[in-house]
From Swiss-Prot:
Top-level taxonomy: Bacteria, Bacillati, Bacillota, Bacilli, Bacillales
Superkingdom: Bacteria
Protein name: Segregation and condensation protein B
Organism of provenance: Bacillus cytotoxicus (strain DSM 22905 / CIP 110041 / 391-98 / NVH 391-98)
NCBIfam families: SMC-Scp complex subunit ScpB (TIGR00281)
A Pfam family of this chain: SMC_ScpB
UniProt keywords, alphabetically: Cell cycle, Cell division, Chromosome partition, Cytoplasm
Gene Ontology biological process: cell division; chromosome separation; DNA replication
Biological role: Participates in chromosomal partition during cell division. May act via the formation of a condensin-like complex containing Smc and ScpA that pull DNA away from mid-cell into both cell halves.
Amino acid sequence: MERKEQMAITEGLLFVAGDEGIYPEQIAKVLEIEEEDVIKIVEEMQEKWEGEGRGLQIVQFAKAYRLATKKEHAPYYQKLMDTPTAASLSQAALETLAIVAYRQPITRMEMEEIRGVKTERALQTLVSHLLIKEVGRAEGPGRPILYGTTKEFLDTFGLQTLDDLPALSEENEQMNEADLFFDSLQELSK
């Protein structure tokens, strides 16, 4: 196997190993080479990556190698983390989020009755964005999951508590809850 391919496979192994990292002896076993050769390969990769000015580096922690971002780029990564999650949500996810916010705890079936369409994908998106979570189980057949909002939901939308959600007036009850929710959010951000 050529050195270039060994480096490529090592890079892939580092990626797959994630935060836990991978030990030189594990890489050696996979590549069917000596551990000393792995150490040389990693050193060559570190040197090459540094020379190319790449955003990732290989670090060794507790004898395991792992990929890490460069400290000098931390302000840029923080900007990504500070970006509001709502910007990346689909209209369906936003509508579902509004329903959960106002009607929690609520089951998926109840959400689907309100929206008139399936909400499974929207729910998965909201859970993955940590905006909603399972808060219990409803009584009845199948004991369906109950969903509610999270602290991240409050933080994302600048709310202290759920009581800060704009009240639904009787005249607005006919209006789409999602539209009401976002109109209210615009008022809060003024």
